[in-house]
Design a protein with these regions (language model features):
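Amide-donor transfer/coupling interface in amidating biosynthetic enzymes
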Residues: 11-17, 51-132
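Cysteine-nucleophile active-site neighborhood
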Residues: 1-67
């Protein structure tokens, strides 16, 4: 974020203050987290609490590449509207070595299994992210 002067401020103005919808895809989803740990600890936007860490999947190939079944995570306050039309068992294609560990389970909308649960979709309010 710091590599592009004014980018973080512009994003915060639009998304936090004006509630402009935001969709982060792949690394864009990872930027939503509080911190990232790729090469060094780096602050993220902090819109979805959590950390991005290297996938730990003993016996499995990293980067994680391929089709995986989505598992829709049921939240206490009901499904997020972005999930309308998606069901557990639907497929998504992943190419990544790093995964978000979400702090608040209410923000985890879907995951895939790859040596354990791997975050696939996160969201809150008008902020969404997909790893695929």
């Amino acid at each position: 974020l710091s590599a592009v002067p004014g980018l973080e401020e512009a994003l915060r103005e639009a998304v936090e203050r004006r509630a402009v919808p935001f969709l982060g895809i792949c690394v864009g989803m990872q930027m939503l987290a509080t911190t990232g740990h790729e090469y060094r600890q780096t602050p993220g936007l902090g819109w979805i609490g959590g950390a991005v860490t290297r996938i730990a999947a003993p016996g499995l190939k990293v980067p994680h590449m391929g089709w995986n079944d989505l598992v829709i995570d049921h939240r206490a306050n009901g499904p997020h509207p972005v999930l309308d039309g998606l069901a557990t068992g639907d497929h998504a294609y992943f190419v990544h070595s790093w995964a978000m560990q979400v702090a608040d389970p209410a923000h985890l909308l879907a995951h895939a299994d790859y040596g354990g649960p791997v975050t696939a979709i996160v969201g809150r309010d008008t902020i969404l992210g997909t790893q695929f």
